[in-house]
């Protein structure tokens, strides 16, 4: 009996037990979180256990060190060195293999001219034409069964001008080399193509060029390796459909990492980046986009270097891609299910996949069946008189306390916006923690205040039922979203899991009521509200000498019945579950209770029905209901809390640094934090009113710490810097001033930093800072002149870009007024690889340009030839982007054809000034090398000293990236 008493004391529903269980639950969630984020670092292959994998990793790490020795954007000479190194490594690996072939676009002088939607801005209506000279390196491994659809493995080897490209995309490139080395030794069944492509950063151009190669017809599937962050684990960022997600599930058995929440966020454009996977997907390929995704404030900066990453990160991407490619290369694939997939991993141990369409069907079943079952059980309990109606005050406590918590949260978010809107960039834990504790603390205070004045015994069960109703409404809304998005809202699955588990908990309570003992007379009220018509003077005695009242199992379902103190502490009144009787262990009904309670039946035979129930049946009910609160807790709290916490962490981990990219992103992150914290709080709210004073004191303390950290701590540090975008602009049409543009978030960050630069501080240079769109600030000042060329005389910036008009028949008398106008331009640009031409007419709303021609010089042996590429567009062409490989070829030869105004609007008005058909052409040319020197008059000087000054003198809480495809932009303009 003593052991039984101890056992019952440990498991009964009281404050200490609940608080301890909450502590255990959140401790386990924390340990799982740490395990998930640290485990991959311990799984490096050992030479004695996995010599082949160890060799692949060590070789890849060495390749990465060489590739990332310097900045190597497409616009730099270092880009050619990386290309040549990769070509050498590819030839070394393939050797004399009989089934391997190598194709070098640079050697074959492959180029394309095509019309391109802005890949980084799908909403853009700007019509763009792109000319690109490729230096992709392709390798074909012919499979044993070449008739099977092939697999493409792709990564880009260019970096941005301001980053070494260790994770973007050096790790992807060396992982491809490792995959190539592995598959050379283990010949695949299906054909594999490896695409080491160039110039992903400024238009996804290497991937676009792939489809100009004959080998592109051999591949149906693609594994794209990318870096949109700067380290950590490589995530399955997105995948084509349920079939490809299941292939990942079947292949990546060690350390799988993926979540369809990333996929939904990426497609919803919460992340302003793109990868080559977009191009492959648009061209009908199916596959997997595996990428590094954090931290974004180091992405595209000088800290994207080998110093800020690790072998563990490299091995995670390499091993993931190797498992996936080996499986796809050697197995027949079931690809029938092409609906979008919902997927997630459990701490890197297990990967789960379900079709989003299937999830929608299950949601519909849940939405239809659960209320039917709940209402049915409610009607049964009403019929059996085991359900007691509750006052409106009892029913409104939980939703009103939740609403109050949301209001408090909203007020606090206003304080964040006013005082520290970028706090998420430094550490999203503190604002999320503040939001979370606000909701649960507000709920605790309001519910307990209500219970003090108007006690409610079964608050927990009422809250669980109301939680079920709230989640049913949420699931209805999210299911509608899922359906209307053609099942592409793949990040909503946590709500389905939460709803299912909370529904089971609510149904269990209703089932217990429905199966409860029938009574003819209710002897008490479950909720003794202030508005009761009468009050009960009977006192319930739930336990005497360890014996339980067998006539009230439903009371034990919801609260402790072990001693009088517990009853008073919990505000217990047993009529919620059915009849309430005071039972003496020897004499049944207490005589004094019968004498003083006028509600006691006058006829002794009135309880014959209850007495007729078998002792075995009552014992079984008692055994089931005694610990039901624990079952409810285990259903509602641990699993939903872990899934929701992990989901919120996934979202914030990927998006918290996007607050630096504009006010819209800031409000998005703030909104996600608020909604996420509410969802994290929902599982514990039905129980939290019951916690002990230590728990609620710790909650209040955590809120105070979190709020102070959120509102008062500076958002940027050395490890979490503010990313600022740099460019130096020289507009030749307005002089030779080298105007430095520094773009970053508003908030008095940029100007104080710039004012401390020596060139500004000691020369009284004026800094002009203005607000631009989306909460960004642009600061401009005249900086030091760049030294882009080596020269023996004075550097003349105006000689960097010269425009020659070779032909223009706009004013020719031989041209009919209805005939398109034709002009030819020769751009003389020194040591350059990228220029952009923008076309505009002052007299026409849309660009009148309908045709572009690029005259290309071919240097292939045996003799040079001229190639003409032409593209036409009926809707008009706004922009021509030019990318060439040869630094020594100093000219771009362009042909432009545009319609006169007469053809576009039919207006026959006189043009006395002869200007209505003029075409304005703006030219911008880009240089991206800054970490190198030029020799001017025999002296070595830095190419872009203005950028060097920022790097050297700005506080460590700033990091810098390029604003455009080059760090220096020289502009000019002409009128044709």
Curated annotation (Swiss-Prot):
MF terms in GO: metal ion binding; metalloexopeptidase activity
CDD domains per record: M28_Fxna_like
InterPro entries per record: Fxna-like_M28_dom, M28_fam, Peptidase_M28, PFF1_C, PFF1_TM
Keyword Transport: no
Entries under Gene3D superfamilies matching the protein: Zn peptidases (3.40.630.10)
Major site of localization recorded for this protein: membrane
Cofactor stoichiometry and binding remark: Binds 2 Zn(2+) ions per subunit.
Pfam assignment, any one: PFF1_TM
Residues the record lists as binding Zn(2+) 2: 168, 201, 300
Keyword list, A-Z: Glycoprotein, Hydrolase, Membrane, Metal-binding, Metalloprotease, Protease, Transmembrane, Transmembrane helix, Vacuole, Zinc
Low complexity composition-biased segments: 559-570
GO biological process: proteolysis
Record-annotated membrane-spanning stretches: 16-36, 360-380, 393-412, 429-449, 462-482, 497-517, 628-648, 669-689, 693-713
Family: Belongs to the peptidase M28 family.
Name this polypeptide is given: Vacuolar membrane protease
